[in-house]
Amino acid sequence: MLDLKFIRDNLDLVKRSIKARGLVLDIDKLIYLDDKRKKIITKIGELNAKRNENSSKMRENLDKVLKISLIETGKILKKQLIDLEEELERVSFDFDLENKRVPNILSPDVPIGNSEEDNFEIKKVGIIPRFDFKPKDHLELGRDLDLLDFDRAREVSGSKFYYLKNEAVFLEIALINFSLNKLREKGFNVFITPDVAREFIVDGIGFNPRGNESNIYKIEDTDKYLVGTSEITLGGYYYNKIIDLTLPIKMAGFSHCFRKEAGAYGQLSKGLYRVHQFSKVEMFCFCKAEESSIIHDEFLSIQEQIFTELEIPYRVLNICSFDLGSPAYKKYDIEAWMPGRDGKGGYGEITSTSNCTDYQSRRLKIRYKDQDGQNKFAHMVNGTAIATTRVIISILENFQDEKGGVKIPKSLVKYTGFDYIPFKN
């Protein structure tokens, strides 16, 4: 959510952000509703003053006729106030709805575009493997190495669920421990977060839980949702608090993630790439306004360190305006090389990191005191450390060998306890 004074003072900038994101939003309607809301509040104040004056007169020693007149006036004022308060409630509801739809402004260096083709490639890192044999995709490897079972999961839970088996279980746990240890070494406080959040927290982070395109599951007959990312629960940790930001507060959260992924059934979404449930380690930071861009770049650097140590080839993208979620001021993606992607190999997203400035903290009322003792809204930065399913794809497909097995990246061996997954007949 943006500051309304900022919107009024920077109307053209806000409109350009809306247009660049491909959104349809009438910002002038928001201004109209705000003006109307203020006028109603003023009228209510005036009527309350008249009502108080009328009540004061009634306490005086009056003749019967004048007292009856004041009683009737009091009834009229009461009815007018009720009508105005009901109108204020309706207008405020519409105002809040429109206000929440306004996206964050864009960083000046965000590429303007209308598809993922307009994302700007910053760099490529690592050597794409060349095989002397026909490489398998992760589904074939998962079958031949007895690591994955989608068929039984489909019977038990439905499509886009899966069982991890045997070495894949230890590989997932190794990835979690590897990333959490790295983040702890870098000064992050480590959490296992709830997998459930209340609606006002989900909404405050910038997800639209009631929208037609909502990607998260609601728990029936409650105000709670299964989280699609621990960004939600980490971001809500300091809801309605004034926090000490002498130093940035860096948090690392492990959680399960649940997503509907409606309609995601194409070739590029097969197997583990797009599923209803997966495990993830998330980075999160609360910081001062002047620190968020630095923290954002730091998060990207940590992500690069992780995938460099995992020896996975990747590329870094500066995400274009059309692909940004409403809270994001700027976003980087890292895409890993996946030899089995689309039958010929390609890059697929494995992490992202977003600087959301004070967009989320305004909704969640998370503040800090600046050097002058004034309350300011904290800036909030998030980023994926490890989303296990997609990293497992990358490891299986990049580290397969001619024997049909898969080597384990050296940085993970101390966590897995083995350095090779053999072919199983």
From Swiss-Prot:
Give the main localization category. cytoplasm
SUPFAM superfamilies xrefs: Class II aaRS and biotin synthetases, tRNA-binding arm
Q: Gene3D superfamilies, alphabetically?
A: Bira Bifunctional Protein, Domain 2 (3.30.930.10), Serine-tRNA synthetase, tRNA binding domain (1.10.287.40)
Q: Does the keyword Hydrolase apply?
A: no
Per the UniProt entry, what are the Gene Ontology biological process annotations, in alphabetical order? selenocysteine biosynthetic process; seryl-tRNA aminoacylation
Which cell locations does it reside in?
Answer: Cytoplasm
Which is an annotated GO molecular function term of this record? serine-tRNA ligase activity
InterPro entries from the UniProt entry: aa-tRNA-synt_IIb (IPR002314), aa-tRNA-synth_II (IPR006195), aa-tRNA-synth_II/BPL/LPL (IPR045864), Ser-tRNA-ligase_type_1 (IPR002317), Ser-tRNA-synth_1_N (IPR015866), SerRS_1_N_sf (IPR042103), SerRS_core (IPR033729), tRNA-bd_arm (IPR010978)
What's written under domain? Answer: Consists of two distinct domains, a catalytic core and a N-terminal extension that is involved in tRNA binding.
Q: Subunit structure, briefly?
A: Homodimer. The tRNA molecule binds across the dimer.
By what name is this protein known? Serine--tRNA ligase
Q: Which organism is it from?
A: Borreliella afzelii (strain PKo) (Borrelia afzelii)
| High-level lineage | Bacteria, Pseudomonadati, Spirochaetota, Spirochaetia, Spirochaetales
